[in-house]
């Protein structure tokens, strides 16, 4: 099929491929299977109008695996969190320790955030609609941001309770029970952080960015681990020096500072993503130089790089080619080069001739540093 505009889009969606044009508003939609997209038949790539890079595996399978992997992590974390939350509530009540109870309260918030992340993860798997053409992918980001907000609210409540204990120190703490419960909490949170930790290398040793929901959950678990360690330290202090029971509310203050600090980085990354910023894993100049290095490319403008989620990068660009080179061949080479060097969710390349370039056009200017 021929298109009026030489525009190209690669889109990895679950079980479907989409090809769009600028002027014909025509949509090709067909399932991806082994007969249509074999890996060992490169001649079809030359004859067909679409180059679809699978990077060694089908994008549909990759997306399904990522979804199942994230779901498994969040479900496992929820189960662990629920069990030890109940244990800490009972143990904290018996010990009379605010630090243990606050740790249990934070586990409750973690459990809520894990369930919220599971819901947003399910929502992000829903297919696109005519109104939401990119689908519900960013529901995952909104869920993660809401989870961070919950952390801040609970942290504020715990700081308030700690202040009350500093002002009214008429309370008793059973240090032995506190040590036992806090030791179990440390072990539980170590298991949680191991389960939720997801740094790995993708194809061609490219680092795959973390799923946003799992990343937010990991921050929760990391904050819990710091809290549990500080509770254990304060329990040991109170056990050997009962007159230093002020360590209990001080532990809560330390925990609050650590947790708030741990949310700043992830909040910054999510803010850049929502502002359509270039992903941290990519360099704008590096991507442009890679395109310019392709034989036949004269210039690149209107280059835009952004993300749907932490691991779904989208790129679009206008490329001017030499008249002596077949623009469709150049387009395929650009797509191959980009897909080989970076993990791309979507790639749109509009091929143009040098006469189409306008040096005075504001939209064609390179962005400022």
UniProtKB/Swiss-Prot annotation:
A molecular function GO annotation: zinc ion binding
Entry binding sites for Zn(2+) 3: 52, 54, 361, 364
Region (Disordered): 31-52
InterPro entries from the UniProt entry: Cation_efflux, Cation_efflux_CTD_sf, Cation_efflux_TMD_sf, CDF/SLC30A
Gene Ontology annotations for the cellular component aspect, listed alphabetically: cytoplasmic vesicle; Golgi membrane; intracellular membrane-bounded organelle; plasma membrane; secretory granule; secretory granule membrane; transport vesicle membrane
A Pfam family per the record: Cation_efflux
Localization per Swiss-Prot or TrEMBL: Cytoplasmic vesicle, Secretory vesicle membrane; Cell membrane
Main location: membrane
UniProt biased composition (Basic and acidic residues): 32-44
SUPFAM superfamilies per the UniProt record, alphabetical: Cation efflux protein cytoplasmic domain-like, Cation efflux protein transmembrane domain-like
Catalytic activity: Zn(2+)(in) + 2 H(+)(out) = Zn(2+)(out) + 2 H(+)(in)
HCH Motif, short sequence motif: residues: 52-54
Residues involved in Zn(2+) 2 binding: 53, 301, 318, 352
Binding residues annotated for Zn(2+) 4, in chain numbering: 137, 345
Coiled coil, from the record: none
Gene Ontology terms: biological process: insulin processing; insulin secretion; intracellular zinc ion homeostasis; positive regulation of insulin secretion; regulation of vesicle-mediated transport; response to glucose; response to interleukin-1; response to type II interferon
Cytoplasmic topological intervals: 1-79, 125-140, 197-217, 267-369
UniProt note on tissues of expression: In the endocrine pancreas, expressed in insulin-producing beta cells. Expressed at relatively high levels in subcutaneous fat tissue from lean persons; much lower levels in visceral fat, whether from lean or obese individuals, and in subcutaneous fat tissue from obese individuals. Expressed in peripheral blood mononuclear cells, including T-cells and B-cells, with great variation among individuals ranging from negative to strongly positive.
Reported function: Proton-coupled zinc ion antiporter mediating the entry of zinc into the lumen of pancreatic beta cell secretory granules, thereby regulating insulin secretion.
Complex formation: Homodimer.
Protein name, per record: Proton-coupled zinc antiporter SLC30A8
Name of encoding gene: SLC30A8
């Amino acid at each position: 099929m021929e298109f009026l505009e030489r525009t190209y889009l690669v889109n990895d969606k679950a079980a479907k491929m989409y090809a769009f044009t600028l002027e014909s508003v025509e949509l090709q939609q067909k399932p991806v299977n082994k007969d249509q997209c074999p890996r060992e038949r490169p001649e079809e790539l030359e004859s067909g109008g679409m180059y679809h890079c699978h990077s060694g595996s089908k994008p549909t399978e990759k997306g399904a695996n990522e979804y199942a992997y994230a779901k498994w992590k969040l479900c496992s974390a929820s189960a662990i969190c629920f069990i030890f939350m109940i244990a800490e509530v009972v143990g904290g009540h018996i010990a009379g320790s605010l630090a243990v109870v606050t740790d249990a309260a934070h586990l409750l918030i973690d459990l809520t955030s894990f369930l919220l992340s599971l819901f947003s993860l399910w929502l992000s798997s829903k297919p696109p609609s005519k109104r939401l053409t990119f689908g519900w992918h960013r529901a995952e980001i909104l869920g993660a941001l809401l989870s961070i907000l919950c952390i801040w609210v609970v942290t504020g409540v715990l700081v308030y309770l700690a202040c009350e204990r500093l002002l009214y120190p008429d309370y008793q703490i059973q240090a032995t029970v506190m040590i036992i419960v806090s030791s179990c909490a440390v072990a539980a949170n170590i298991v949680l952080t191991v389960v939720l930790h997801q740094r790995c290398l993708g194809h061609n040793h490219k680092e795959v960015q973390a799923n946003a929901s799992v990343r937010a959950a990991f921050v929760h678990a990391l904050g819990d681990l710091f809290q549990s360690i500080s509770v254990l330290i304060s329990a040991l202090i109170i056990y050997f020096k009962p007159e230093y029971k002020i360590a209990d509310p001080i532990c809560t203050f330390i925990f609050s500072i650590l947790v708030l600090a741990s949310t700043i980085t992830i909040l910054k990354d999510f803010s850049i993503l929502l502002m359509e910023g270039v992903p941290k894993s990519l360099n704008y100049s590096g991507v442009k130089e890679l395109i310019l290095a392709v034989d036949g490319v004269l210039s690149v403008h209107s280059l835009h790089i952004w993300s749907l989620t932490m691991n779904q990068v989208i790129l679009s660009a206008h490329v001017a080619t030499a008249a002596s080179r077949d623009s469709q061949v150049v387009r395929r080479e650009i797509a191959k080069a980009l897909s080989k060097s970076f993990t791309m969710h979507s790639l749109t390349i509009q091929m143009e001739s040098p006469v189409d370039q306008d040096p005075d056009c504001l939209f064609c200017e390179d962005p400022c540093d």
